[in-house]
Amino acid sequence: VLVTGVTGYIGGRLVPRLLDAGYRVRVLARDKNRLQGRNWINQVEVVEGDVLNYSSLLPALSGVDAAYYMVHSMSSSADFDQRDLQAARNFGEAARANHVGRIIYLGGLGDPNTDLSRHLRSRQQTGAALSEAGVPVTEFRAAIVMGSGSVSFEMIRYLTERVPVMICPRWVFTKVQPIAIKDVLDYLVAALETPESAGKIIEIGGADVLTYGNMMLEYAQVRGL
């Protein structure tokens, strides 16, 4: 099993879950030195490569049964979405060339018929681009992933603890369906053992629909602030 995006929040937590489940894991990294200190580093095969460099993906995907695509740009550059599309197409083509059985991708939850942000629309377009080469893709779509260290959790923690009084921006009233990191990892690992998920888009989320403001209030109550 190949895992990309292992320096990120979710990819780095997916690797030990796969190892615990008994899978042989290979990880792709642009710079393997950035992985030093990870407690799983000696249990995996590390291959250096870049999703924007097609030729570097061929050895990374050689002999792989399934691949996790956990890459998306957090850049605000003018062409980040085009770079994301090119990276996904490179990965899909390299997976096809190596006869990879399936790609598993974690994208973003949102109605494509509404006015999505460029980043969210790009994540959904990435899922489509991955499948263009013909390799079956299991695409999970999640809103915000919550867990200690996640961007969303740390933002809520910081604003609640450091900014007790503020003029609320509009996004505070945005409704979202948060999901715990543990549940996301459960879905990602279970997909390997669920072949019927191939070719499907699966929306995942927690039981509650909340605003960011609701979550900040709940955090404050739990912390006794």
Locate predicted features:
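NAD(P)H-binding glycine-rich loop region in Rossmannoid oxidoreductase-like domains
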Residues: 33-98, 108-113
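Conserved beta-loop-beta element that borders a ligand/cofactor-binding pocket
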Residues: 107, 128-158, 162, 167-170
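Glycine-rich "substrate-gating" loop/helix at the edge of Rossmann-like oxidoreductase active sites
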Residues: 143-149, 170-181, 205-208
